[in-house]
Amino acid sequence: MRSLGITGGAGLALGAMSSIGLAPAVASTPRRFQAPAAGDLIGKVKGNHSVVILGGGPSGLCSAYELQKAGYKVTVLEARNRPGGRVWSIRNGTEETDLNGETQTCTFSEGHFYNLGATRIPQNHNTIDYCRELGVELQMFGNQNANTFVNYSGNKPLANQSITYRAAKADTYGYMSELLQKATNQGALDQVLSKEDKEALSSFLTDFGDLSSDGRYVGSSRRGHSAEPGAGLNFGTEIEPFGMSDVIQGGIGRAFSFEFGYDQAMTMMTPVGGMDRIYYKFQDAIGTDNIEFGADVSGMKNVPEGVTVDYVVEGKAKSITADYAICTIPPHLIKRLNNNLPSDILLALDAAKPSSSGKLGIEYSRRWWETEDRIYGGASNTDRDISQIMFPYDHYNSDRGVVVAYYSSGKRQQAFESLTHRQRLAKAIAEGAEIHGDKYTRDISSSFSGSWRRTKYSESAWASWAGAGDSHGGMATPEYTKLLDPVDRIYFAGDHLSNAIAWQHGAFTSAQDVVTHLHQRVAQTA
């Protein structure tokens, strides 16, 4: 079972265990957020109770939205000229000057876009709840596609070959099933499985791996056809399988477990028209008179009257004092503010390490991925710097579309960070052509790229905690835990203070947690 988990991911191992009655039951007891209500404070607590919120991204706008429900006076200060923060949809007219000093203006055709930030929503995330509440229309997001490719470089067997996911899965699952079938038949599992267990496992493996009657994998229609079945006696031509040794050594199944992840398994969703639609809806609900865009925060201090925040708008220095503050500025940028935070808090903030990630979108005037490769959504994966090529999930069968030519993170993204956009584009096209061929280099109308480490006011795609075992969760490091509590009247919120780092869900749960504690604190003053 352990080898099944390593090769095919947890889903394959659990499937086999379930077949013989060994899979554990899963219990789920979600904790529901109780939003503050209008009657909570009226007639009970004196004062208007103002809250200034630093940052108009997911956690900031969510905090403002929920606090307004109970009658709090909220002011959101956002340095950019748009809502959403790192949730950023690139479309015609988008203009940005990065920290390299290069300015790009997007010229995509009307109605076409890509999400430079968050792009997908798991169905178990509370992001969907806010979409329902705010009236944001959702559509399916193709997180996986059997027709997209894997292509890995190097000198191992099957290297530098574009292999469809369906073929890679059929061969990998087929041979792994054959090997486990042989091990079972040869008595290797007699110490742990009864006769009935082995019969049940054999039945599962025969079906899962599409094995022959004698327990061998000899190919499968699941791989696809070089000539599709047609009418009459046209039975099509199945594609022959790769050899067992080549499949094992080539590691073509290395990306299979991605779609087994709790937060990556289908069905995935995304807003129609771009992920930023959520934040324009938040903006409408909160009211633009309660959000100040272009507000570059320079200072934040606890004072006897509450919290004073200094900021600059179009070169003019301004200041606001509120009863409380919720700071959603990225942790590694907070220490740049003029502040009176204790030294242990500054050290805790410094433990949140910025990460590299970025994307490049190419608008093609011809949807070759649909007409030639029959790809509708999903992504091709590689070990090259581009990491993956993501295909559009909208405008199917139209005349053009935007392909995300890379979505890379870590060291692979660092290979793009210092490059100009033209250099990024050239590198992306060259690596993409190694997967999808010469057609990848033609019919390009326009492009736009972004690197979050080189994006002003973010300078990171997400934060990871030094010493944590999981880059996408706080894992209760001392620094992480320290920032869960307020510093006098200053609260901290963001996905970095959740166990869903880099997800909008994480930002929302953090905001909900802060709103709950702040509201309880105010109510206790009654």
Question: Which role fits each region the language model picked out?
Answer:
Residues 1-17:
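N-terminal export leaders
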Residues 3, 7, 21, 26-39, ...:
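Conserved flavin/dinucleotide-binding core of flavoenzymes
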Residues 36-178:
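N-terminal glycine-rich phosphate/pyrophosphate-binding loop and immediately adjacent elements
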Residues 41-45, 105-113, 253-267, 406-415, ...:
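Short glycine/proline-rich turn/loop motifs
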Residues 156-179, 183-184, 323, 334, ...:
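Rossmann-like dinucleotide-binding core of oxidoreductases
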Residues 160-179, 241-246, 250, 332-333, ...:
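Core domains of carbohydrate- and sulfate-ester-processing enzymes
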Residues 181-296, 304-306, 321, 337-338, ...:
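Active-site/ligand-binding neighborhood in enzyme catalytic cores
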Residues 293-404, 435:
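Mid-domain catalytic core of redox enzymes
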